[in-house]
From Swiss-Prot:
Main location (coarse class): nucleus
Expressed in which tissues: Expression is restricted to spermatocytes and is absent in spermatogonia, spermatids and spermatogonia (at protein level). Expressed in adult testis and embryonic ovary. Expressed in the convoluted seminiferous tubules in spermatogonia and spermatocytes.
Subunit-structure text: Homodimer. Can form higher-order homooligomers. Interacts with SYCP1 (via tetrameric core); the interaction remodels SYCP1 homotetramers to 2:1 heterotrimers with SYCE3. SYCP1/SYCE3 heterotrimers form lattice assemblies as part of the mature synaptonemal complex via both lateral and head-to-head interactions. Interacts with the SYCE1-SIX6OS1 complex; the interaction recruits the SYCE1-SIX6OS1 complex to the central element of the synaptonemal complex.
PANTHER family referenced in this protein's UniProt entry, alphabetically: SYNAPTONEMAL COMPLEX CENTRAL ELEMENT PROTEIN 3 (PTHR36686:SF1)
Keywords recorded for this protein, A-Z: Cell cycle, Cell division, Chromosome, Coiled coil, Meiosis, Nucleus
Gene: Syce3
Record organism: Mus musculus (Mouse)
Upregulating conditions: Up-regulated in cryptorchid testes.
Coiled coil residues, start to end: 8-75
The protein's name in its UniProt record: Synaptonemal complex central element protein 3
Localisation per UniProt entry: Nucleus; Chromosome
Amino acid sequence: MADSDPGERSYDNMLKMLSDLNKDLEKLLEEMEKISVQATWMAYDMVVMRTNPTLAESMRRLEDAFLNCKEEMEKNWQELLTETKRKQ
């Protein structure tokens, strides 16, 4: 059985390269769409916060409460681990 000629291999390589390029471009387009959606939501959030200043303050208080709660939970978790190690 004879090997395929160099022109045919070159053509097959070109088709594979074009197919790979097409897949890469599709992935890039999908990523750009995701970034575009994120930017749109960021712009929307900025408009909402500027038109409703109390929302920004509420978000800050909520974040502070969350961080305080998280800190307390971590402290309690460390205490529990310390007690468990002492008992063993």
